[in-house]
Amino acid sequence: MNNDMDKIFNPASGEAEEFINHQEILDTLQYASEHKNDRELIENLLEKAAKCGGLTHREAAVLLECDVPDLVDRIFHLAKEIKQRFYGNRIVMFAPLYLSNYCVNGCVYCPYHAKNKTIPRRKLTQEEIRREVVALQDMGHKRLALEAGEDPRNNPIEYILESIRTIYGIHHKNGAIRRVNVNIAATTVENYRRLKDAGIGTYILFQETYHKKHYEELHPRGPKSNYAYHTEAMDRAMEGGIDDVGIGVLFGLNLYRYDFVGLMMHAEHLEAKFGVGPHTISVPRICPADDISTEDFPDAISDEMFERIVAVIRIAVPYTGMIISTRESEAVRRRVLELGVSQISGGSRTSVGGYADSKPEHTEQFDVSDHRSLDEVVGWLLDLGHIPSFCTACYREGRTGDRFMSLLKAGQIANCCGPNALMTLQEYLEDYASPETRAKGQQEIAKALEHIPNPKIKAIATKCLEEIKQGKRDFRF
């Protein structure tokens, strides 16, 4: 009879319980606990990580457990250095777009669960999607993350594909959605191939928790209850031709140490099997919502530990983009932007139809902590010295998968991303920004131009910025 103890850890395996191996996680947690004050080991790990080659799951676990104050300070300092080296001061902007909250699953932490009779169910028509996208374009968004519950009857793959075509086809005034990322349930290789052919950017799927027994308790019914099928979804996505995948856990569902190690092992697995790790790692935390109370989840983590998790992920997986949601407050967002986060949402609505409707029904998936408009978030980022980026050039220029990662790991991606961020910010300032934000943005663009080291790239970027001011759009390196 097979059980967890029969499985042997193998990061290159295609079997969930081998590349996310329960016993290896337990052994790693014990090792980290035993070595959390081992100064020589931790200093060696920091020295290794400073070379930007990443760390193993076991090495990362030691840094997460470390409680020596001066070494913890060095962990945070190194995370900031690595973030700056790979991503500079650029922060990619996006917005979630909820298509439908119909769902057949029984996830006990999500208000969309099938037995919740208090939440109004809604699925957007293509005309309603058009209105949502126009509203998003009028804010200035260029990049969306599609969200939909799992319901084969109400939300079949054909509906998702039609919605993607609708979104890409809408050009309102100077607006355009240039990259559609998709966060939908685990599906088949063939369906991933169809999503690829539809032109999606990143396929995103949160594991929720890597602890198999706890996962099955949290997902008692519905297709998502199949742990292996869910955990192996990214393998099928990459087999279907999707180059960029995004992983994440919902911190607070389970012991954070366990899920942190599982997350690192998943990144190692993708690198071992496909030669390219996750394009993004998301770090959501459990939060209140309709029919859901955080009091039911005793493993919720503090802001301080959340910041540590972000810092160690940045050190251990230096190349990955990191995403934080509007679940987090302005204060938490400010801190983790320094430590590792490279993408945030702005002006987000987590309800179906929430952008076009002035008074949407109570269909939110979770409560939002940051209620600021996109313009307010952009202005805030500029005040902090960040460059808000609406760039989607890598996806449209074919710099995806291993091609993107090789450029990023070699430190060459900044030659594209830096000027592209400035040009897309200039577009935003011309078309959507308030006068106050426009003034801040022009000042930051002027400063950033002076720091472009390549004279040829600087000259081209300067010329393009002037042409954007004259009404031209969509320049990119």
Model-found features: residue ranges?
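Radical SAM enzyme core and accessory elements
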Residues: 1-44, 48, 331-339, 348-477
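An N-cap/entry alpha-helix motif that binds or orients negatively charged groups
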Residues: 47, 51-91
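Canonical Radical SAM [4Fe-4S] cluster-binding loop centered on the CxxxCxxC motif
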Residues: 87-88, 92-128
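Generic structural signal for well-ordered alpha-helices
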Residues: 95, 133, 161-168, 192, ...
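Core AdoMet radical
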Residues: 114-131, 135-238, 243-253, 275-282, ...
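Conserved C-terminal portion of the radical SAM core fold
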Residues: 148, 202, 207, 228-292, ...
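Short glycine-enriched, charge-decorated loop/helix-capping segments at active-site entrances
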Residues: 218-224, 295-299, 363
